[in-house]
Amino acid sequence: YCGSSGDNFVQMMKQFKKVTVVGRPTLGILDYSNCCTVDYGDYQLMFPTSRCLCVDQGKGMTDQGVEPDIELPWSPDHFERDVDLDKCLELIHQGTVK
């Protein structure tokens, strides 16, 4: 899984015709960033100083993330081998990617 800058990277790459995103959805934690922290002793207040402009257009990605073109659900096989890479290589050898 990825989030933050990873969300941004996947979102940008999906705009290219030759890119096929394989895996699981990103985490969707890109809308607010550059957090500052104020320490009050017993607690801390953390707040963002940047906000993605897409939030104003109702197109924020909080809790949505970026959906892959080909979803590969997580499984225990991921502990043993790189399932995502294996699928990508399979698609390349089949010639079925963009």
Question: Residues of each region from the PLM?
Answer:
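C-terminal "post-core" interaction segments
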Residues: 1-98
